[in-house]
């Protein structure tokens, strides 16, 4: 409806519709009706791609034919999600989140945690939390929950990885920067002094006696809202007797 109104306004102003759109395009820093400002945006880039396309520049001959252009965006806001993750003595990671699983979300969470830490997928146990045990988590809907919860899980996993690295350094008596954490195998190693290595599971079994249990906690994650833009160009032909509209291109 907005795009139809833009075309009507362009007609009243006797202006090319795409020129009107370009003159009024929202750009980075534009104030939005809700009080926030537009961040990085592909709005103008999409407009340029439309007007520079061979389709837009081609001739459309013949009666009862017309060309329509419409632009649109989708707010890809993935929300905020709280995550708690704890390393057990047996090397398993207990992952507690607040987003409801309606189709594979826990599998995604476990995959992200396992990939960052270099442990097996089945060594991560995803669980639901509630308002007594976990921070705020957005609703599960649309296309944003997976990316939003993945960002939170990734940051929690990185906290665990860093703390495991620090613990290994303390056990070996070396500087943290001298410990390498292999995210493909979950093995920590150092070549300072005597070459030594330790698996994620081995260190997990020693955590209580070497400084306490290791965990990760994230309140928000790193996925922020942004809009994705797109444009369509369509050529149609209308039958004046029946009103049937045929898409030509």
Give names to the regions the model predicted.
Residues 11-13, 17-117, 129-249:
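Cofactor-centric catalytic regions
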Residues 6-7:
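Amphipathic alpha-helical segments within well-ordered protein domains
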């Amino acid at each position: 409806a907005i795009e139809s109104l833009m075309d009507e306004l362009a007609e009243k102003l006797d202006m090319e519709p795409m020129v009107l759109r370009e003159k009024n395009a929202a750009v980075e820093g534009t104030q939005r009706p809700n009080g926030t400002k537009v961040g990085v945006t592909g709005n103008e880039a999409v407009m340029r791609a439309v007007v520079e396309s061979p389709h837009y520049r081609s001739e459309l001959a013949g009666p009862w034919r017309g060309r329509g252009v419409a632009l649109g965006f989708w707010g890809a806001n993935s929300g905020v999600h709280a995550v708690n993750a704890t390393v057990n003595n047996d090397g398993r990671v207990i992952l507690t989140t607040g987003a409801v699983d309606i189709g594979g979300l826990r599998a995604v969470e476990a995959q992200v945690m396992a990939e960052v830490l270099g442990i097996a997928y089945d060594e991560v146990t995803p669980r639901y939390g509630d308002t007594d045990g976990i921070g705020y988590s957005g609703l599960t809907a649309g296309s944003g929950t997976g990316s939003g919860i993945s960002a939170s899980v990734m940051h929690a996993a990185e906290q665990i990885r860093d703390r495991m690295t620090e613990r290994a350094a303390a056990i070996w008596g070396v500087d943290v920067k001298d410990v390498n954490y292999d995210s493909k195998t979950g093995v920590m190693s150092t070549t300072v002094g005597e070459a030594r290595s330790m698996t994620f599971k081995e260190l997990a079994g020693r955590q209580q006696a070497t400084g306490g249990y290791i965990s990760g906690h994230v309140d928000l994650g790193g996925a922020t809202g942004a809009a994705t833009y797109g444009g369509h160009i369509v050529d149609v032909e209308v039958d004046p007797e029946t009103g049937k509209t045929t898409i030509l291109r």
